[in-house]
A protein has these predicted regions:
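Primarily recognizes the serine-hydrolase "nucleophile elbow" in alpha/beta-hydrolase
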Residues: 45-119
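Short beta-strand/loop motif that positions the catalytic acidic residue
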Residues: 143, 149-155
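Acidic beta-to-alpha connecting loop that harbors the catalytic carboxylate
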Residues: 153-156, 185-187
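Short beta-to-alpha linker loops that shape the active-site pocket of alpha/beta-hydrolase fold enzymes
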Residues: 22, 27-31, 110, 186
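Short amphipathic alpha-helix adjacent to the substrate-entry channel of hydrolases
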Residues: 5-25
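Mobile cap/lid helix-loop segments that gate and shape the active-site cleft of serine hydrolases
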Residues: 102, 106-139, 145
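Conserved alpha/beta-hydrolase "acid-adjacent" motif
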Residues: 156-165
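C-terminal catalytic histidine-bearing segment of alpha/beta-hydrolase fold enzymes
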Residues: 168, 172-230
Length: 230
């Protein structure tokens, strides 16, 4: 929420595209320019813009889906989870939440972070006066969005127990489909790095992501571009 730019994650878009999936990697405004919930509104507007763009004739041959899988890492996984589970943000952007989101992929996500100990993150959520109902875990029972939650083998920045495992358990308790996978040999940073050719020697996130996406494709008839050859 206070650092990062989409240009740093071009490798993620390229990797997912090579797997056959139309992929967009958007920016969102950062603290101190904004606080919660402005970055969620940015994310919802990005999805609305993407939907409009994909309706243009030049994308027709890609057969783009009208339903989206939201994916993010760390703070980005928080954003993706909130947009997937809390209908307010997409509805406010003019989208039908129920039919717009078909899946969630979170990597080392921050889903249940109160009370916040990181002094860099505290002002983003107006510590100690946290806004109510502002964590993904609060919406675990709001609707059935299949979730794949990927965790590193070890994480000193975001507690796996308090976040990934807690959200997984909350989703399952609410009757929702959720799967957790721990990626061997990774930490908080290298987990997303496994999508880069430079870290292919690490445990792979591509296999569980691809399997999850293909299961959604079969279930919901999601459209994907043909995988690149080679």
């Amino acid at each position: 929420w206070n650092r990062g730019d989409k240009s740093e994650y071009e490798f993620v878009g390229r990797r997912l595209a090579s797997m056959g999936y139309i992929t967009a990697v958007p920016n969102y405004r950062l603290y101190p320019e904004v606080q919660y919930p402005d970055f969620l509104e940015d994310g919802a507007q990005s999805i609305a813009h993407l939907k409009k763009e994909l309706q243009k004739p030049e994308y027709k041959n890609l057969n783009p889906a009208q339903q989206y899988v939201l994916m993010g890492h760390s703070a980005g996984a928080y954003n993706a989870a909130m947009l997937a589970l809390d209908p307010r943000w997409l509805n406010a952007a003019g989208l039908e939440h129920q039919t717009s989101v078909q899946g969630l992929i979170g990597l080392a996500g921050a889903y249940n972070i109160y009370p916040i100990k990181d002094t860099d993150v505290q002002p983003v959520f107006n510590h100690p006066d946290y806004p109510p109902k502002s964590q993904p875990i609060d919406y675990a029972g709001s609707r059935n969005v299949p979730a794949l939650l990927l965790a590193p083998q070890s994480d000193t920045l975001v507690s796996i127990e308090r976040n990934t495992k807690a959200l997984h358990q909350a989703l399952q308790s609410a009757g929702n489909q959720s799967k957790v996978e721990s990626i061997e040999g990774t930490d908080h940073i290298t987990l997303i790095g496994t999508l880069s050719p430079l870290l292919f020697f690490k445990g792979s996130t591509t296999k569980p992501i691809d399997q999850f996406m293909r299961e959604l494709h079969q279930k919901n008839n999601l459209s994907a571009a043909n995988p690149e050859q080679g």
